[in-house]
C-alpha cells in the first residue's frame, strides 16, 4: 500500500519495517532527502525501497550521474521538467559545492531551479524549492518551502502576517527568494556552458555518510515547534533504528482527528528557523517559547485568518498541498496490529507535554523516550517501546491500555523491561489484570509499589524492590494476645505453630528469601520471637519465660504508663512490663503449671513401675501429693490472672462543653456501652476455663450478662474515684444529681448509686471485687439450659470456691468467713434487679429512639433487640444465691 509522504514523495511501505511516532511522514521525507536522492518520476521512486536507492546512489560516480542525466532527453534543460524537488540541507559545503548543488540532476536529490519548478508546476505536482545556502541568515523557513510560485503567498491576509510576528518578515522572505532565483539561473547557465559536473554524492552529503548539521537542526526545529523533546535528537546516530520518531495520530476506531489550521505550525517553523543562531546548543532555545504560546492560543479558538482545504475557494486564505500531511491514515495496513494503542490528537501534542499530574483524558499522555536509556543491546527495540509511560513513575495518574499480565502486554504495545542486574519484570499498569497502584506506579503482579521517581536524569530506573508472585504466602504475625491456654486440655502437645503446615511451591530462588524454604518455626505467644518450648503452660521464648517467673513470684506491682494496650513484640517487649505480664496471663501462663507438669510426669512414672497394690504408706503419700497440688492452686495465682486481664479505662467520647440534654446524655451512654462491650468480650475470653465452654454457650453467657457486668464495674469505679457520691460511668461522663434527672432514668441511677455505696459499707477489697465480677458472668442462663450445661455448672462452682478461698485467706474464724460469704453473695444478687430495670429502660428507649433522637450503635441495637426480649419475657433468668 502506498502512503503519501510529507514533501510530496510516494513511498511504498516495505513489509519488514514499521514506523511509529509523531509526524512520521515529515521526518521520513527529510530522511529520504538526506540519504536517498531518488529519481525524478514517481514511478521510479516507487520501484525500489529507500535503502536500495541510497546504495545505488553511493555506487554511482559523479561522471556516470552526469552521463545518465544527459542521456535521458539529450538536453541539460531537461531538469526543468522534474516533478519533484528537494532541499539542500548541508550548510558546511564549500562554495563550489554550494553552487553545484543548485543545479538538479535526475539521480540526485538536489533542488531544481525556481524558474524551472514554476514551469513544471503546470502539469505535475508542485514541490518547494530551496533558497541559496550562501548566507546563514537565509535558512529556509516553512513559508519559503512553498516557493515563490505558491498562490497563497502573495495573497496572505494581514491576520496571518500578525501571527508571523510582523509584516516585514514576509517581505524579507520574498526578497530572498527573488535573489535566489536570479543567482541560481545565472550560475546554472554558466556551469552548463563550462560542462562542470552538477551533482555528486560528496557534494550532496558533504563528503560523509552522516546526517548534516542543517538536517539535524531542521529536525530539531520542527520537533521544538511541535512541542516534542529535543534531547533525543541530540544523541541520535544515523542508524534507522535509533530514530526517536513519535507518532501523534487519532485513536484507531475513534472519531477522526480535526486537522489544525496550517498557519500556526508555519508560524512556529518560521520563527524557530529564523531565530536559530549559528552556534547550536543541546538545549531548547528560549526563542521557541513565544511561538509555542501563540500557537496554543490559536488552538483555543483564535481566528488565524486562514483555513484548510474546505475553504480553498475563499480569497485571502493560505492553502497547503494535499500531500503535506502530518497525520497517519486510519486505513493503514498495520491498523489491525495496533488496536490497543492510544494515539493522541495533534493540537494537544503541539501544546507541549502537560504538567503533572496528568489529566484523565485518554489523549492526555505525551510519549517521550530516549534511545540511550536502553543501551546498545536495546538499539533495535528502542523505537518500538512507545508506551514507556514514564509519567506514571513520577506519581502521575495516567495508566496505559492493556492488562497487567506479561502476555497481555506483549499482545499490545506495552513492552517489558528488565534491569541488567536484577532481572526483575516491569510490566504495565494493568487495567484489568492486576491491582491498582496508590500513586499510579507500575504494578506487574497486582501489587502496589511505592511510588518513586527516576533514578537520574538519564532515565535509568531505580533498583527494583522484591516483588513476590501472587501465589506466595506471606508470613503471618504471631497470634492475637487473646489466645489463652486452656486449663482443661494439653493443647500445646499438638501445636503446629501459627503458620500451620505451609508449603511454598510457586516460589522462585531469586525472588524469595532463604527463610521461606525452611519449615515454619513456632513463635512465642508473648513477643513473637522464636519459641524455645512450653514454659509455665504456654509456648514462649526463653526471655518471656524468665520474665514471667520473676514478675509472678516477685512482690513488685507494675503499672502501665499508657492505656494498658502497649505493643509487645520482639523489639519492644521490655518497654512495658505491665502489659507484658498481662499478655503472659492472657496466654495462660501460671506458676503452678510447671509444678503440675512435673508431678504429672512423676505420677505416670510411678504408675508404670508399680504393678502391685499400693501400701498404706504409699496411699498416704499420694494423698499428701494431691493435697499439695490442691494447696498449690492457691488464690494468689488466680488473682494475678484476674488482675492482668482486667480492662482498662474506657472513655465515652462525650462533649462536656455542650449543654446537657436527654438525647446527648443517652447517646453518649449507648456509645460507652458498645465500647465497654468490646472489652467485656476480650476479658471473658481471657478468663480461666471460659474457652472450654461451647462456642454458643460463650456467646449466650456474654449477651445475657453484659448489663450486670457493666453496672457492677461502674459501681466499683464510683466507689474508688468519687466515693459513691456520683455515678462514674467514664472519665468524661460522670452523672451528678442534675444529669440523673436530665437523663429521665433517675430511679435507676439511684439504685446504681446505692450499689456503689454498698462497696464502701461492706469494705469490698479489690481481690473480692475481681472474683465477684468473674462469678457474675456465670449467673444468668436460659431456662432451657445451655448446650453443655454440666460443664457450665462445674465452671461456676469452681469460681464460687475461689471466692470462698479468697475470703478464707483473710479470715481465720470460720464464722466470720461464712458471714462474709453471705454478704458478698447478697451483693451479687442485688445486681440482677438493677440490670433487669435497665434492660427494660433500654428496650423502651430503642423503640422510641427515632422520636427522641437517641443514637444506638449497631452492636448495641442488635443485642437489645434480640437478646433483651428473652430476659424480659422470662426465657432467660438469673441464678440467685438466696431466695428472693
Curated annotation (Swiss-Prot):
GO biological process assignments: androgen receptor signaling pathway; intracellular receptor signaling pathway; negative regulation of extrinsic apoptotic signaling pathway; positive regulation of cell population proliferation; positive regulation of gene expression; positive regulation of transcription by RNA polymerase II; regulation of protein localization to plasma membrane
Main location: nucleus
DNA-binding region: 523-596
Binding-site positions, 17beta-hydroxy-5alpha-androstan-3-one: 670, 717, 842
InterPro entries referenced in this protein's UniProt entry, alphabetically: Andrgn_rcpt, NHR-like_dom_sf, Nucl_hrmn_rcpt_lig-bd, Nuclear_hormone_rcpt_NR3, Nuclear_hrmn_rcpt, Znf_hrmn_rcpt, Znf_NHR/GATA
Region (Interaction with LPXN): 516-883
Positions of the UniProt region annotated as Modulating: 1-522
Region (Interaction with ZNF318): 1-551
Subunit structure: Binds DNA as a homodimer. Part of a ternary complex containing AR, EFCAB6/DJBP and PARK7. Interacts with HIPK3 and NR0B2 in the presence of androgen. The ligand binding domain interacts with KAT7/HBO1 in the presence of dihydrotestosterone. Interacts with EFCAB6/DJBP, PQBP1, RANBP9, RBAK, SPDEF, SRA1, TGFB1I1 and RREB1. Interacts with ZMIZ1/ZIMP10 and ZMIZ2/ZMIP7 which both enhance its transactivation activity. Interacts with SLC30A9 and RAD54L2/ARIP4. Interacts with MACROD1 (via macro domain).
Domain free text: Composed of three domains: a modulating N-terminal domain, a DNA-binding domain and a C-terminal ligand-binding domain. In the presence of bound steroid the ligand-binding domain interacts with the N-terminal modulating domain, and thereby activates AR transcription factor activity. Agonist binding is required for dimerization and binding to target DNA. The transcription factor activity of the complex formed by ligand-activated AR and DNA is modulated by interactions with coactivator and corepressor proteins.
Name the record gives this protein: Androgen receptor
Species, as recorded: Eulemur fulvus collaris (Collared brown lemur)
Gene: AR
